[in-house]
Regions:
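Positively charged n-region of N-terminal signal peptides that target proteins for export
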Residues: 1-6
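Sec-dependent N-terminal signal peptides
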Residues: 7-16
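Boundary at the C-terminal end of the N-terminal hydrophobic targeting segment
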Residues: 25-27
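Short, solvent-exposed loop/hinge segments that bridge or flank secondary-structure elements
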Residues: 31-70, 101-109
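Contiguous, well-ordered beta-strand patches that form the walls/edges
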Residues: 64-106
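Low-complexity, intrinsically disordered Gly/Pro/Thr-rich segments
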Residues: 113-124
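Edge beta-strand at a domain terminus
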Residues: 123-140
Length: 140
């Protein structure tokens, strides 16, 4: 009897993990709007990002990419195209090191059904870090 219960437990866990992965991979499109954020300068000065009405739309392309459908501009498009994403349960976690002109950025994102949290570390320049929170919904 003990082996039977172990088999059932392992089967249920495997099925649960598989369903979480399929859930993220099958629901592919998100629309996100800016909620809040801030930057940190070299001297430690924190500056709030001004709230806009802009929203962006992106589509997850398994196994690890994001297709920007609507963005704020070419810089955001390039960042999204270079990010590599990994599904973890119902969340997508992305990262990239991006070179834009003379800037080198380390970018990370955690994307869920409800929000996106993006962090950017700047290699050079006056601005050293940026954190941005966005409200997101799955639209497909």
């Amino acid at each position: 009897m003990s082996k039977f219960y172990k088999f059932i437990t392992i089967s249920v866990l495997f099925y649960s993990i598989l369903m979480c992965y399929i859930n993220v991979a099958s629901a592919k499109t998100w629309q996100c709007s800016f909620k809040d954020g801030w930057t940190l300068n070299q001297d430690g000065t924190e500056t709030s990002l001004s709230k806009g009405t802009f929203y962006g739309t992106r589509e997850y392309l398994p196994p690890d990419r994001m297709l920007p459908l609507q963005t704020h501009g070419p810089m955001e498009t390039q960042i999204l195209e270079e990010m590599v994403y990994q599904p973890v349960a119902t969340t997508l976690i992305g990262h990239a090191v991006v070179e834009i002109g003379s800037m080198t950025l380390s970018v990370s994102e955690t994307l869920t059904d409800k929000e996106s949290i993006i962090t950017v570390i700047f290699h050079d320049g006056v601005t050293k870090a940026l954190v941005e929170r966005n409200l997101c919904i799955r639209i497909e």
